[in-house]
Amino acid sequence: MKAVYPGSFDPITLGHVDIIKRALSIFDELVVLVTENPRKKCMFTLEERKKLIEEVLSDLSGVKVDVHHGLLVDYLKKHGIKVLVRGLRAVTDYEYELQMALANKKLYSDLETVFLIASEKFSFISSSLVKEVALYGGDVTEWVPPEVARALNEKLKEGKR
Ligand code: ADP
C-alpha cells in the first residue's frame, strides 16, 4: 500500500525522519510530499527542501520525494493514493490536524489520515524551533540530519551577505 507524508519540511528534522522510517515499516511505498503552507513563511524554496530531503533519505528504499503546488487531494487523486500520514507531537497539534483531516475527507471521501505519535525524544523538535535557534547561532546538530545543519549554515551566511 502507498501513502503520502505531506508537510512543509522547512527544513526536514530528525522528528520528520523518525516518522518517515516508521511509516516505511507500515506502508510499501511512501511519498514525502513538500507542499506550500500559506500559514507559514518559509526559509527554503520548495525545490531546495525537496533536494535536502532526497539527500537525507538517500539510503532508504521505498521512499520518493515530490513537490506539489495546490490542493493536496488533487495530488492524491491524480496518483491514486488513499492514505495520508501525519505526525502528532502534543495536544497542541491535535486541533489543526483534526481540522485538516476532516477537511481532506470532505474533499476526498476515500481518503484516510493515519497519525503516528512522535517519539518521545523528538517530540519537542519543530522546523520553526530549529530555524529560530540556528538564526541566533545555537547548535541544532542534535535535532537535524548533518546535511540540514550544513544547509542552514549556508542559508544564514547568504542572508548576511
Ligand atoms: P505542515 O506545515 O504541513 O504542518 P510540517 O513540516 O511542520 O508541515 O509538519 C509535517 C508533519 O510532521 C505534521 O503532521 C507534523 O505534526 C509532523 N511533525 C513535525 N515535527 C515532528 C516531530 N518532531 N515528530 C513527529 N512529527 C512531527
From Swiss-Prot:
Cofactors that this protein relies on: Mg(2+)
Biological pathway: Cofactor biosynthesis; coenzyme A biosynthesis; CoA from (R)-pantothenate: step 4/5
Catalytic reactions on record: (R)-4'-phosphopantetheine + ATP + H(+) = 3'-dephospho-CoA + diphosphate
GO biological process, one term: coenzyme A biosynthetic process
Entry keyword set: ATP-binding, Coenzyme A biosynthesis, Cytoplasm, Magnesium, Nucleotide-binding, Nucleotidyltransferase, Transferase
Localization per record: Cytoplasm
InterPro entries associated with the record: Cyt_trans-like, PPAT, Rossmann-like_a/b/a_fold
EC number: 2.7.7.3
Record has Transport as a keyword: no
Binding site for substrate: 8, 40, 72, 86
Residue(s) at site: Transition state stabilizer: 16
CDD domains tied to this protein: PPAT
GO molecular function, one term: ATP binding
Chain positions recorded as ATP binding sites: 8-9, 16, 87-89, 97, 122-128
NCBIfam families listed in its UniProt record: coaD_prev_kdtB (TIGR01510), cyt_tran_rel (TIGR00125)
Function according to Swiss-Prot or TrEMBL: Reversibly transfers an adenylyl group from ATP to 4'-phosphopantetheine, yielding dephospho-CoA (dPCoA) and pyrophosphate.
Assembly and oligomerization: Homohexamer.
UniProt name for this protein: Phosphopantetheine adenylyltransferase
Protein species of origin: Thermotoga petrophila (strain ATCC BAA-488 / DSM 13995 / JCM 10881 / RKU-1)
The encoding gene: coaD
